[in-house]
From Swiss-Prot:
Belongs to the acyltransferase 3 family. It is found in: Cell membrane. It is an enzyme of class 2 (transferase). Keywords: Acyltransferase, Cell membrane, Membrane, Nodulation, Plasmid, Transferase, Transmembrane, Transmembrane helix. It comes from Sinorhizobium fredii (strain NBRC 101917 / NGR234). This is Nodulation protein NolL. Signal peptide: none annotated. The lineage of its organism: Bacteria, Pseudomonadati, Pseudomonadota, Alphaproteobacteria, Hyphomicrobiales.
Amino acid sequence: MGYAAVPPVERGSCSAGANNRDITFDFVKGILIILVVLGHLLQLVIYRNTDNFWLSPYFKAIYMFHMPLFMAISGYLASGTILRTSFCRAVGDRAVQLLIPMLFWCALIETAKLAAFFHFSGVTAGLLDFSRELVGTYWFLWAVLASFLLTKLFAAFNLLSKWILCASAIVIALMPITLSIVPLLRYTYPFFCLGFLFAQTIEEQANTMLRHKSLLMFSCWAVACLCFLDWGRDTYAYNNLVLVHDAQSAKQVLLMFTGSAAAAAVAAQSLFHCWRVLCSTRLARLVAVELGQSTLLLYLVQGAVFRLTDLIQFGELWDGKTRIVVASAIGAAIFGAATAVLWIVNDLGYVSRIIVGAPRRLKRSS
């Protein structure tokens, strides 16, 4: 999610800037980070104080694929680093890129909580609360880092065959560990492997997909639609914990992985097509450059905003229209705040790395 790696050029038809960077994946990431914010707005504002968001078709449509596709893109874009960079440097760079901004924004959350509630329960309790924020609020970044580390370990020992990666994805997905965010890591790791493997066999896959593209996409659409219809509250990894203990739980876990994979494939192909059609328009390039190249910062900002709003009591008596207006305002504020932060710190060297993770490699071309 937060990678600044330059994607390969075979995908897109439009590049940007003097370095001819293909920003196809930036466009896809820009759309996905919008969906991340929309999903949280549905959960924490539109359906606030209820559990009805689990049954929302909009929430379902987003959560079926947005994080799996984000993880697959992370695996795809990280493949070059995993294969060509030394273990210590690759892991160190990725840890610095992700962990330092996480620490900064979690410290900001804790400071805001302390200032708002004027309650300090001691150093030990404060550290425990900080660790919970660090792990829970930004679980996806931990999933990216863990997936990167595990895949890099396989590379370090020359064990990166597709069979070993596929086996590792299955074993990790089925491990009966439900501690903290481990179920979410087990859910997303197979998609990281899928993206990584696709990057290694892009030419072979491209030829196969061109020959059978219509059949493949029809099959993915059909599977995604069927899974959407059968998708329920217990199909989400947050609720089933990716745990198989009987026939019903096995059905839900299988439905979750199958539906997520099919929906992610449909979404990816649809977004690639949108980019090919719209890449010359100002709006599409704004999404790619301003949002897609700032997904790490946007994820950090929205996590902080939603964590703080979750601690405030509001909206009990609001009607639907009021909730939509407030959700729109919060969403706009998130993107506005992230843009302002990036504008302020983008050229400040180490300050930028602490707050943003890494500056964007591409400015908007004139």
